[in-house]
């Protein structure tokens, strides 16, 4: 029987240990795909911007079009979502280049320079870039006129006045933003076009400055302008600088296409399922029309009337956001507690007598009773909305019912289904509501004729008022609570500098250079899958 001596045993164990170690090294050195790394990490790291569309803190916590898309994408991967919120576009591309984030999820244009260094995902909506001015002020109709206005000087101007006018006429854009690249391309044809870059503001701030008269012109994308007009109705489009451009997410350019391929599949799936259309309807479906006179009156009411009634809206809003109830009340009565209609509805929430009696309101002209009763009536309608409708869209169906009646709303859903639409999508159903006026259609419904077009406009108006109130009271901020994450304050950067055609390359290079030392002013927050 063979016997191992101690020396042989040690050699044997050494050989086995060495073999196992080398095998482990080979396993560890084996490259894994980017997608596998994300799954092993258990976290998808997404960079986005803090604005009204991509990401903000709403009454129910984190929200935004890109936030919801990113959360669904993380769910599909089966990992947590880690959101890194930047305040400037210039921070996002370097973060992606360094590997601090896995993708950029915010509405960025597919500029040639960005596409050269990074890989865009599928386009999920389109925007045009426009020159913005204040309604009633001097309006340039094209770039040639804009340059003429910038360089004009009247005979009566002294040097100080001329300097002030030149500053006001100069376009301002956010430093290291994609608009820097756009204006460089425009300067090739209009070398006298002047613009200033600023470090202490975002695009929304610049639009506000145009509204207040501090600036005469700014550049904005069409959707951003539409959102800003709800608070600054004086803003208007002078002319379009570009045609509609695609916006998309971005990932790193790499031979490894695992993450990119799954992103393509993800957008294809949500496009086919209708989920993408539902989310776009939720966030931008209400911004198509703009009534200057109505918006001006509403902005005045925000300052003069809302402070008086806000406590009651907050007290009786129940499970609803009080700002939504305030928007509903403005649509009904313009916050007039004594409002009356020839049709018999009365009060702040314009209740009919039978409705008031059903919710325990004895005096419809008492604002407290009216608000309490209106909220209770809305709550009952929401409870009747079919469960098949997505939670975030139930309120729009309920508001349509508040206006036109529950039966007519259900008629519109059935009509939508007959026409091949989705009866659970507000975006589809709202387009069928106006058909309830036409005999060709209402003769085939259970409840007959209805002013469905008014119900559609009613809901869209409330949505616009709601977004304006959110912006006005300043509660769409980045920080919701200590649990949401920790924010780092952006240190002030250098003052505005005039960018001429000769030095614009430096600014553009900074925006996309992987080595630029940007301040990491980000909020990092984790979301469970």
Swiss-Prot record:
Locations listed in the record: Cell outer membrane
Gene that encodes the chain: mltF
Region (LT domain), start-end ranges: 288-529
Residues annotated as the enzyme's active site: 332
Organism the protein comes from: Vibrio vulnificus (strain YJ016)
Non-LT domain: annotated span: 28-287
Name of the featured protein: Membrane-bound lytic murein transglycosylase F
Primary role: Murein-degrading enzyme that degrades murein glycan strands and insoluble, high-molecular weight murein sacculi, with the concomitant formation of a 1,6-anhydromuramoyl product. Lytic transglycosylases (LTs) play an integral role in the metabolism of the peptidoglycan (PG) sacculus. Their lytic action creates space within the PG sacculus to allow for its expansion as well as for the insertion of various structures such as secretion systems and flagella.
Signal peptide location: 1-27
PANTHER family reported in the protein's UniProt record: MEMBRANE-BOUND LYTIC MUREIN TRANSGLYCOSYLASE F
UniProt family annotation: In the N-terminal section; belongs to the bacterial solute-binding protein 3 family.
Chain positions covered by the region annotation Disordered: 510-529
Top-level taxon in the UniProt lineage: Bacteria
Primary residence: membrane
Compositional bias annotation for Polar residues: 519-529
One Pfam family cited in the UniProt record for this chain: SBP_bac_3
Topology of the protein relative to the lipid bilayer: Peripheral membrane protein
EC number: 4.2.2.n1
UniProt keyword annotations, A-Z: Cell outer membrane, Cell wall biogenesis/degradation, Lyase, Membrane, Signal
Single GO BP term: cell wall macromolecule catabolic process
Domain notes: The N-terminal domain does not have lytic activity and probably modulates enzymatic activity. The C-terminal domain is the catalytic active domain.
Catalytic activity, as annotated: Exolytic cleavage of the (1->4)-beta-glycosidic linkage between N-acetylmuramic acid (MurNAc) and N-acetylglucosamine (GlcNAc) residues in peptidoglycan, from either the reducing or the non-reducing ends of the peptidoglycan chains, with concomitant formation of a 1,6-anhydrobond in the MurNAc residue
An example Gene Ontology molecular-function term: peptidoglycan lytic transglycosylase activity
GO cellular component: cell outer membrane
């Amino acid at each position: 029987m063979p016997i191992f001596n101690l020396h042989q045993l040690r050699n044997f164990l050494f050989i086995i240990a060495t073999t196992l170690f080398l095998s482990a090294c080979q396993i560890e050195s084996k490259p894994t795909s980017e997608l596998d790394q994300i799954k092993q990490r258990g976290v998808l790291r997404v960079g986005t911007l803090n604005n009204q569309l991509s990401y903000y803190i709403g009454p129910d916590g984190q929200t935004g079009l890109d936030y919801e898309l990113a959360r669904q994408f993380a769910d599909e991967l089966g990992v947590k979502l880690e959101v890194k919120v930047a305040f400037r576009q210039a921070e996002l591309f370097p973060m992606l280049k360094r590997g601090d984030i896995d993708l950029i999820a915010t509405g960025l244009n597919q500029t040639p320079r960005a596409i050269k260094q990074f890989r865009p995902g599928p386009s999920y909506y389109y925007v045009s870039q426009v020159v913005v001015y204040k309604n009633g002020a001097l309006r340039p109709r094209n770039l040639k006129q804009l340059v003429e206005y910038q360089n004009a000087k009247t005979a009566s101007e002294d040097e100080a006045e001329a300097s002030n006018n030149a500053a006001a006429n100069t376009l301002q854009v956010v430093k290291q933003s994609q608009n820097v690249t756009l204006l460089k391309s425009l300067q090739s044809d209009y070398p006298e076009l002047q613009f200033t870059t600023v470090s202490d503001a975002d695009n929304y701030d610049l639009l506000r400055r145009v509204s207040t008269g501090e600036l005469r012109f700014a550049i904005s994308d069409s959707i951003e302008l539409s959102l800003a007009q709800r608070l600054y109705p004086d803003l208007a489009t002078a002319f379009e600088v570009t045609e509609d451009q695609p916006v998309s997410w971005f990932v790193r350019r790499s031979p490894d296409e695992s993450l990119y391929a799954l992103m393509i599949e993800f957008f294809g799936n949500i496009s086919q399922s209708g989920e993408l259309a539902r989310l776009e309807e939720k966030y931008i479906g209400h911004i198509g029309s703009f009534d200057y006179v109505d918006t001006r009156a509403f902005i005045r009411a925000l300052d003069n009337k809302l402070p008086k009634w806000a406590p009651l809206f907050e007290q009786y809003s129940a499970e609803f956001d009080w700002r939504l109830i305030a928007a509903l009340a403005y649509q009904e009565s313009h916050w007039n507690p004594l409002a009356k209609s020839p049709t018999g509805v009365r009060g702040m929430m314009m209740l009919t007598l039978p409705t008031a009696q059903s919710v325990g309101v004895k005096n419809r002209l008492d604002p407290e009773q009216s608000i309490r009763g209106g909220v209770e009536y809305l709550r009952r309608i929401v409870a009747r909305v079919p469960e098949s409708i997505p939670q975030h869209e139930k309120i729009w169906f309920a508001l349509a019912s508040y206006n036109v009646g529950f039966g007519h709303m259900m008629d519109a859903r059935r009509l939508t289904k007959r026409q091949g639409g989705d009866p659970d999508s507000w975006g589809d159903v709202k387009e069928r509501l106006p058909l309830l006026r036409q005999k060709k259609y209402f003769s085939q419904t259970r409840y007959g004729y209805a002013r469905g077009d008014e119900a559609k406009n009613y809901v869209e108006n409330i949505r616009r008022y709601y977004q304006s109130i959110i912006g006005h009271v300043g509660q769409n901020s980045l920080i919701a609570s200590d649990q949401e994450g920790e924010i780092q304050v952006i240190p002030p950067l250098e003052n505005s500098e005039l960018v001429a055609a000769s030095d614009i390359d430096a600014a553009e290079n900074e925006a996309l250079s992987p080595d630029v030392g940007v301040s990491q002013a980000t909020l990092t927050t984790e979301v469970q899958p």
